[in-house]
Amino acid sequence: VAGDYKRQFDPTCAPFEPIISDVFVTEATFGLPVFKHPDAKSQIEILINSIKKFPDRCHVIGVYSLGKAQRLIKMMRDFGWNDTIYIHGSLVKICELYKKFGIDLGKLEPATIQDKPKKPHEYYKGKLILAPPSALSDVWSRRFPDPIIGMASGWMTVKQRAKQRGVNLPLILSDHADWNDILKTIEQVSPKEVWVTHGSEEALIYECEKRLSLIHI
């Protein structure tokens, strides 16, 4: 039983290890051929380049509080981004826990407007702010004047979904395997049966039936 899994690089956790099994239960969150995630490092480069391109604006990026936020922060650090990263209150304790387990996330500060030496418009120029996706459309995000709104998610492959969320900077960074990685994992596990759940089951089941007949010919 795989649960949620990804095959892309993540500096904050151990990689997924396929184990040969008779029955494999896989998720199918991105179980359609349209979902082919780019290399995660390319998305970090897009974010860094955008921050440099718009030094007078802040970037507010939607990330899930557990896992996605810490992965993005750590990858930014590994790319040499040493500036303070500002985080929503819901991320604080989880990031502190990661630090206790030895994950160096660099300097983080709460994304507040109190006790700052300048007004928010001036203080947050050129800064990176991370928040849960729900906060992007909330009153919370309106404290940052003229922000560039981004979202780090596999769903950003779908341009219409990004548009609906008011996302200016879609970053295709996912903690779920895409179509190709799901199929690669199935081949590596080499099961006699595949059970598919949570997502686009029919398309993946159809593809599995074809591939399993070749694996166990």
Language-model regions: role of each:
Residues 1-14, 46, 54, 112-145, ...:
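Core dinuclear metal-dependent hydrolase active-site scaffold
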Residues 44-57, 63-125:
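Hard-cation-handling environments
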Residues 23, 56-61, 84, 126-129, ...:
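Residue-level preference for the first positions of well-ordered beta-strands
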Residues 3-5, 28-30, 64-66, 90-91, ...:
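Active-site metal-binding loops of divalent metal-dependent hydrolases
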Residues 186-192, 196:
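Proline-aspartate-enriched helix->loop->beta-strand connector
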Residues 1-67, 78-79:
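His/Asp/Glu-rich metal-coordinating catalytic cores
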Residues 149-187:
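A C-terminal functional module that forms or caps the active site or interfaces directly
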Residues 215-217:
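Conserved small/polar residues in nucleotide/adenosyl-binding loops
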